[in-house]
Swiss-Prot record:
This is Antibacterial factor-related peptide 1. InterPro entries: Abf-1/2, Abf-1/2_sf. Expressed in the pharynx and body wall muscle. Its main location: secreted.
């Protein structure tokens, strides 16, 4: 149930959730798969094929792959490109 609630929060459009939030617990063994799943789901919601948690300057960051630009791009970058209401 917790996973489902977190997933709903991350899939809401333009909710201000950073890529660090979806991958924040990637170093905790039990939470590793959940963090990866949240990253992938967030990227899929941004019309990318997949997502992966990586460390950038010791900060966990969600990178989306298989997007229209064919490059890996951080989730934060994709969210910042969304039209603002």
């Amino acid at each position: 149930m917790l996973y489902f609630c977190l997933l709903l929060v991350l899939l809401l459009p333009n909710n201000g959730v950073s890529s660090e939030a979806s991958c924040a617990r990637m170093d905790v063994p039990v939470m590793q798969r959940i963090a990866q799943g949240l990253c992938t789901s967030s990227c899929t919601a941004q019309k990318c094929m997949t997502g992966i948690c990586k460390k950038v300057d010791s900060h966990p960051t969600c990178f989306c792959g298989g997007c229209s630009n064919a490059n890996d791009v951080s989730l934060d970058t994709l969210i910042s490109q969304l039209p603002h209401n």
